[in-house]
């Protein structure tokens, strides 16, 4: 009798222990999920296994067309009308022609600096077309096509590259550092990656203001993704659930550093899920795919779920006019990419097969754009430069005494030594 009671007591204790264990495990898993894992479900395991990064499958590359421009799955074709399609093509080719002329002009010493977008025209136009005018854009320095799509004029481009008095930035920035409040494009700054956390801040402000049909979009390259500010921005956006799209142009090189020396994981997109970002990798030379991906990303971002897009592309040009890429890559590599996978060539086939484009129209358009670029270039070259008084303006509503004194001292200096300042004749009249 005593032994039976003892065994029964042990069984009850065992059941209670098991119940307590189950309850304890459930408690811990619930706590881990809500407090540590972003509400993701996890389970305990008794199998010791370290995740092998080399065995983790890479994220797929979304595409609509193949390398020669054929639509693979008709259901993925956004079916643009003729007007929209031609605007897309003309924006890409206009950018390409402008790049060629301004690059050559820098080599002639007529402007001080330039950066081309050769080979990346598709991700500019495809993404810009999927956004809304009210969306706030933070660019890096290779997004001229986004501005073209938004209506930034050829005159604006030329004035900025010359830094003349009609430049929207009053000549205070080096070439390629565009910005326009009217087009919701924040002025570009030179320090790498600073725009990412700034863009997240803007997106957070939209969320706080309950601006329900506006997002922030920030463009950056693979090199910028290696900077600490990128990781801070990813975490900031995911934690605060901001309406933002991170658009990474992975073009293979951070100036001279190839991507193989920048990261050991699954590219830039591979970082997204780890930070809690909704993520897609897209063929950046496929305008249709970039458009679809960006449009869907915008829909998701509007629900306060940040999205990372990695656009796989290739930089056909040098990093800038200060770079000679033949020092770190072969001309054969560049030629092969240009011949086998160019976004303009791919989309040209798309519109040609629909009867919207032909070689005669191509020749007429090329001639028209070259004339327009050269005309605006010549006009910008002749315009006066901003007066040096502008150095003191646009910070304070009313110029403080110390700045007025500095301005007056500069006036006195220039008046005394004006023979040493021949450029005074090229300046706009004193305000």
UniProtKB/Swiss-Prot annotation:
GO terms for cellular component: mitochondrial matrix. It catalyses: N(6)-[(R)-lipoyl]-L-lysyl-[protein] + 3-methyl-2-oxobutanoate + H(+) = N(6)-[(R)-S(8)-2-methylpropanoyldihydrolipoyl]-L-lysyl-[protein] + CO2. The keyword Transmembrane does not apply. Thiamine diphosphate binds at residues 140-142. The keyword Protein biosynthesis does not apply. Keywords: Fatty acid biosynthesis, Fatty acid metabolism, Lipid biosynthesis, Lipid metabolism, Metal-binding, Mitochondrion, Oxidoreductase, Phosphoprotein, Potassium, Transit peptide. K(+) binds at residues 189, 194-195. The branched-chain alpha-keto dehydrogenase complex catalyzes the overall conversion of alpha-keto acids to acyl-CoA and CO(2). It contains multiple copies of three enzymatic components: branched-chain alpha-keto acid decarboxylase (E1), lipoamide acyltransferase (E2) and lipoamide dehydrogenase (E3). Required for the production of the monomethyl branched-chain fatty acids (mmBCFAs) isopentadecanoate (C15iso) and isoheptadecanoate (C17iso). Belongs to the BCKDHA family. This is 2-oxoisovalerate dehydrogenase subunit alpha, mitochondrial. It comes from Caenorhabditis elegans. The lineage of its organism: Eukaryota, Metazoa, Ecdysozoa, Nematoda, Chromadorea.
């Amino acid at each position: 009798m005593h032994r039976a009671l003892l065994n029964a007591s042990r069984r009850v204790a065992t059941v209670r222990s098991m119940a307590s264990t189950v309850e304890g495990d459930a408690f811990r898993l619930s706590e881990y999920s809500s407090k540590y894992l972003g509400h993701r479900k996890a389970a305990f395991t008794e199998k010791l296994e370290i995740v092998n990064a080399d065995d983790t499958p890479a994220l797929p590359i979304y595409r609509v067309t193949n390398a020669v421009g054929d639509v693979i799955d008709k259901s993925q074709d956004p079916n643009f009308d003729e007007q929209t399609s031609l605007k897309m093509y003309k924006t890409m080719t206009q950018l390409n022609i402008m790049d060629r002329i301004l690059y050559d002009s820098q080599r002639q010493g007529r402007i001080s600096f330039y950066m081309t977008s050769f080979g990346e025209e598709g991700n500019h136009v495809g993404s810009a077309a999927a956004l809304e005018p009210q969306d706030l854009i933070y660019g890096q320095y290779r997004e001229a096509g986004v501005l073209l799509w938004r209506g930034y004029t050829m005159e604006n481009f030329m004035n900025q590259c010359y830094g003349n008095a009609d430049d929207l930035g009053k000549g205070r920035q080096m070439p390629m550092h565009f910005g326009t409040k009217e087009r919701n494009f924040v002025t570009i700054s030179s320090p790498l990656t600073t725009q990412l956390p700034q863009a997240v801040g803007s997106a957070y402000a939209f969320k706080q203001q309950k601006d329900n049909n506006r997002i922030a979009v920030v463009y950056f390259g693979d090199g910028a993704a290696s900077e600490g500010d990128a990781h801070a921005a990813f975490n900031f956006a995911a934690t605060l659930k901001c309406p933002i799209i991170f658009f990474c142009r992975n073009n293979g090189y951070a100036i001279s550093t190839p991507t193989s020396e920048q990261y050991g994981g699954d590219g830039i997109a591979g970082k997204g899920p780890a930070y809690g970002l909704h993520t897609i990798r897209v063929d950046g030379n496929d305008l249709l795919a970039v458009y679809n991906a960006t449009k869907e990303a915008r829909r998701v971002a509007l629900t306060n779920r940040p999205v990372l897009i990695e656009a796989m592309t290739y930089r056909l040009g040098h990093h800038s006019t200060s770079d000679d890429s033949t020092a770190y890559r072969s001309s054969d590599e560049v030629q092969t990419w240009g011949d086998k996978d160019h976004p303009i060539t791919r989309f040209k086939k798309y519109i040609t097969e629909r009867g919207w484009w032909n070689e005669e129209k191509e020749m007429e358009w090329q001639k028209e754009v070259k004339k327009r670029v050269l005309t605006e270039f010549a006009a910008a070259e002749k315009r006066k430069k901003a007066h040096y008084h502008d150095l003191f303006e646009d910070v304070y509503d009313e110029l403080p005494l110390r700045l007025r004194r500095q301005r007056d001292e500069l006036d006195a200096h220039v008046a005394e030594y004006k023979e040493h300042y021949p450029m005074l004749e090229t300046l706009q009249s004193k305000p």
